[in-house]
């Protein structure tokens, strides 16, 4: 259990760093919850370093200025922080947790509506917008993995 909490702490630091970049409203708690359900904070070896399970289509969406002109100002913020987002490849963002978190944040920023603050609301938002019907997760799983200290359901990966 301690290993899970240590890993969750690392994910929390990354999520809070993403908030400090200023790519949109602060959503660190939602990013942490996504990491819990998508990869058990990266402990699920099948996820590799793709902690937020950003797929190639979602990644392309984070670089698509035609569909999402609001990305332009976010690219400038990233460039000012030494990250030339339009030049990155999927392989790069999949293998580096910070870039993976940025991809998740940009992808979420392209979605409609505000992110709910409560766990059930976030579970529904995640399933409707992030995991979608083609993803294998459920709102029940999102809630279960994010209840209590956030270690439920991750014990199998330690």
Indicate residue ranges for each PLM-predicted region.
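Alpha-helical scaffolds flanking conserved acidic
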Residues: 25-33, 118-126
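Secretory-pathway/luminal and periplasmic proteins that interact with or process carbohydrate-rich
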Residues: 39-46, 114, 131-140
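Inter-helical turn/loop segments and adjacent helix faces that build the functional surface
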Residues: 111-119
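Long, amphipathic alpha-helical surface segments
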Residues: 123-158
């Amino acid at each position: 259990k301690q290993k899970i909490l240590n890993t969750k702490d690392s994910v929390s630091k990354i999520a809070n760093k993403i908030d400090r970049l200023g790519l949109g409203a602060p959503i660190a708690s939602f990013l942490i919850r996504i990491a819990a359900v998508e990869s058990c904070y990266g402990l699920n070896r099948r996820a590799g370093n793709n902690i937020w399970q950003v797929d190639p289509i979602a990644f392309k969406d984070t670089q698509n200025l035609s569909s999402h002109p609001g990305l332009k100002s976010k690219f400038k913020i990233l460039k000012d922080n030494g990250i030339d987002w339009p030049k990155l490849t999927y392989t790069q963002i999949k293998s580096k947790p910070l870039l993976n978190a940025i991809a998740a944040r940009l992808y979420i920023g392209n979605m409609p509506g505000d992110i709910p603050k409560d766990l059930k609301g976030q579970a529904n938002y995640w399933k409707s917008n992030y995991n979608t019907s083609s993803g294998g997760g459920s709102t029940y799983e999102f809630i279960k993995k994010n209840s209590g200290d956030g270690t439920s359901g991750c014990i199998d990966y330690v």
